[in-house]
């Protein structure tokens, strides 16, 4: 299968030339195939958030290139990338305007990447599309389009942002620890919805998580970052049978360092 996303020799340094210089990504290479659902794990400072911000366009690269569907995107702004790359953030209130209704938020998401102007209101054909998309969640939001999102629970907001992110059928979906701020029961609910929706639509997805059990249970591929490089990359049948112990062994074998599971949970 052809690569949808290619990262070539990505370097990123913060505060270069100072005593606080931090070389976060060190020649990172990654090939992502269309339809991959990749979990990205690693301890604090491994480069996970930096990688997400580079993909979304919030950070530029110092060296290297990013190719999406064969075209370089490294010089594109966040707005220009937004049509092809959608992102769901860690905190339920991010990515949603809490004083706007569900349908108003979805209308904004539907026009992501477009210039603001006339025709940004909610149309009847939009409502039909929104209801169809929300039905997939099976949590009743399709009947609450005119409810302000400030009255939704954290889990409902994250489920909504997941649907909003995918309204324009992005080439790439970025999930930035989108269950981390939820209680365990709600986190599991959102994860189950995520797996169901991503698999149904075959969206190419990268998700950051600190939960090794989620990383092992969900998705078709798992990569682990350490000191700015990918040290573990597991997919296919190997991923299906992977255990936490296997993962820790692979990390030690490839990095030369020992790892305890708490380092990822706390990282």
Task: Cite the ranges covered by each PLM segment.
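Conserved ABC transporter NBD signature motif
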Residues: 64-72, 234
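H-loop/switch region of ABC-family ATPase nucleotide-binding domains
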Residues: 209-210
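The feature captures the beta-strand-to-loop junction immediately N-terminal to the Walker
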Residues: 41-43
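Helix-to-loop junction immediately C-terminal to a conserved catalytic motif
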Residues: 56
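ABC ATPase NBD coupling module
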Residues: 18, 72-86, 94, 116-117, ...
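A short, flexible loop at the N-terminus of ABC-type nucleotide-binding domains that lies
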Residues: 2-4, 13-27, 77
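Conserved beta-strand-loop-alpha-helix hinge in the C-terminal portion
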Residues: 229-253
């Amino acid at each position: 299968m052809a690569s949808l996303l290619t990262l070539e020799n990505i370097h990123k340094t913060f505060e270069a030339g100072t005593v606080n210089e931090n070389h976060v990504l060190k020649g990172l290479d990654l090939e992502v195939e269309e339809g991959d659902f990749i979990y990205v794990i690693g301890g604090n400072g491994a480069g996970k958030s930096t990688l997400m911000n580079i993909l979304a366009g919030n950070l530029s690269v110092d060296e290297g290139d990013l190719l999406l569907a064969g075209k370089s995107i490294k010089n594109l702004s966040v707005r220009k990338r937004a049509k092809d790359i959608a992102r769901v953030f860690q905190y339920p209130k991010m990515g949603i305007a809490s004083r706007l209704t569900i349908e108003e938020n979805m209308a904004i998401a539907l026009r992501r990447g477009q210039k603001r102007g006339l025709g940004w209101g909610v149309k009847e054909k939009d409502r039909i599309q929104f209801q169809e998309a929300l039905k997939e969640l099976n949590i009743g939001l399709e009947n609450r389009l005119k409810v302000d999102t400030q009255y939704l629970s954290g889990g409902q907001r994250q489920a909504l942002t997941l649907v909003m992110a995918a309204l324009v059928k992005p080439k790439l979906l970025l999930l930035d620890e989108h269950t981390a701020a939820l209680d365990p029961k709600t986190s599991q609910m959102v994860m189950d919805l995520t797996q169901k929706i991503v698999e149904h639509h075959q969206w190419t997805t990268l998700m950051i998580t600190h939960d090794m059990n989620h990383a092992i249970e969900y998705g078709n591929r798992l990569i682990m970052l350490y000191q700015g490089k990918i040290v573990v990359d597991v997919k296919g049948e190997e991923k299906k049978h992977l255990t936490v112990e296997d993962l820790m062994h692979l990390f030690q074998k490839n990095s030369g360092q020992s790892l305890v599971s708490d380092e990822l949970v706390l990282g």
